[in-house]
Design a protein with these regions (language model features):
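N-proximal low-complexity "stem/linker" segments adjacent to membrane-targeting elements
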Residues: 56-111
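Short aromatic/hydrophobic "clamp" motif used to bind/position activated sugar donors
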Residues: 176
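Conserved nucleotide-sugar donor-binding catalytic segment
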Residues: 226-328
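Cell-envelope/extracellular polymer assembly enzymes that use nucleotide-activated donors
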Residues: 90-93, 121, 286
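The conserved acidic donor/metal-binding loop of glycosyltransferases
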Residues: 180-184, 208
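Conserved donor NDP-sugar-binding/catalytic core segment of glycosyltransferases
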Residues: 188-228
Length: 329
């Protein structure tokens, strides 16, 4: 589909001037397959905004030789990462996909509702559980009616990623946290993880994970990622292309989605959802790589996400990875 230059320009100017990711703008951009970058330029002159952004899309035929020069561009743009209001508390949509995790729900939900960061909406999704999960979820929905929605499927969806997509379609927040129903976290988890989004280039921020089994710590994120050249001993913000080359292309450095918060970019690309339908494993890895493209990724070691390993874990590939790594050492 052809997009008029002026229409695209209007979207980009709105995107930048408001200094936030508007779902409507990003949806429009996604539809035209050009969400391959993150805005990190502060406009000094909107007259030549297309000089930078259309060059990114390789449509330099629209510009004169003078307009394409680096000197000309530098006089109209500052290359900086736009920062949001330090006091801003963006709404976080917390999506809790559940299937037969009744024994873990209380600890999970308490760790959400007791967060020190309180600007949240909670979307509880039950995928036709056969245990008493729905009763537990209803108790919390009644206890926190002001910021909770409960959706119970009448039949099982067959794939956890379909539940993710349903939650994303319902989310109103600027940020998304998919908090799996069998995990839990520190009460200041959101406070620390959300801080990174003051930087407009950050597309995903994740926390340190501790792997739990039968109530005991069995591994840490550092142990899981010990064979990568990137250090997870301290917090960082890193360009996506750098961390993909050094780590993300080798191993999924976000082993559990509960440890991550990401920007709400609206509808997920058909390219991703089509692959999701074919995948029983690694769909989260694919999603992260699509999401962070062109931006930066943040990691904090100041708070913990507790990833529970058990027979009904959403993904057992981590358990296989742990077993293999233990044997191979």
């Amino acid at each position: 589909m052809f997009v008029k230059k002026d229409d695209l320009l209007s979207m980009l100017i709105s995107f930048i001037y408001e200094k936030k990711v508007y779902v409507t703008s990003v949806n429009s951009i996604t539809k035209y397959k050009i969400l391959g970058f993150t805005v990190v330029k502060h406009i000094k002159s909107d007259t030549y905004v297309r000089n930078v952004f259309f060059k990114i899309f390789r449509t330099t035929r629209y510009f004169t030789e003078q307009e394409q020069s680096l000197d000309f561009s530098s006089r109209h743009f500052d290359v900086v990462d736009l920062s949001m209001d330090q006091d801003k508390k963006p709404l976080v949509s917390v999506i809790v996909p559940n299937y037969n995790h009744a024994p873990y729900l209380k600890e999970r939900l308490d760790s959400i509702y007791q967060q020190t960061y309180q600007n949240i909406e909670v979307i509880l999704l039950d995928d036709f559980s056969s245990d008493n999960s729905v009763e537990v979820l209803k108790q919390y929905a009644r206890k926190y009616p002001h910021n909770t929605r409960l959706i119970v499927n009448e039949e099982n969806s067959g794939k956890v990623f379909r539940q993710w997509n349903k939650g994303l379609s319902l989310a109103k927040g600027e940020l998304i946290w998919i908090a799996e129903s069998d995990d839990y976290c520190d009460v200041n988890f959101l406070d620390e993880v959300v801080k990174a989004f003051v930087h407009q280039s950050v597309m995903l921020s994740f926390a340190h994970s501790v792997f739990m089994q039968d109530g005991k710590k069995i591994w840490t994120l550092e142990q899981y990622l010990h064979d990568l050249p990137v250090s997870f001993e301290s917090s960082f913000i890193m360009p996506a292309h750098t961390i993909v080359n050094e780590a993300f292309a080798i191993k999924n450095i976000v082993p559990n989605v509960s440890s991550a918060v990401f920007r709400n970019v609206g509808a997920i690309s058909d390219e991703v959802t089509t692959l999701w339908e074919k995948m029983s494993l690694c769909g989260d890895w694919l999603f992260y790589l699509w999401l962070i493209k062109g931006g930066t990724i943040s990691y904090t070691n100041k708070v913990n996400n507790y990833y529970r390993i058990h027979s009904k874990s959403t993904s057992l590939r981590i358990q296989r990875t742990l077993d293999y790594s233990t044997v191979s050492r």
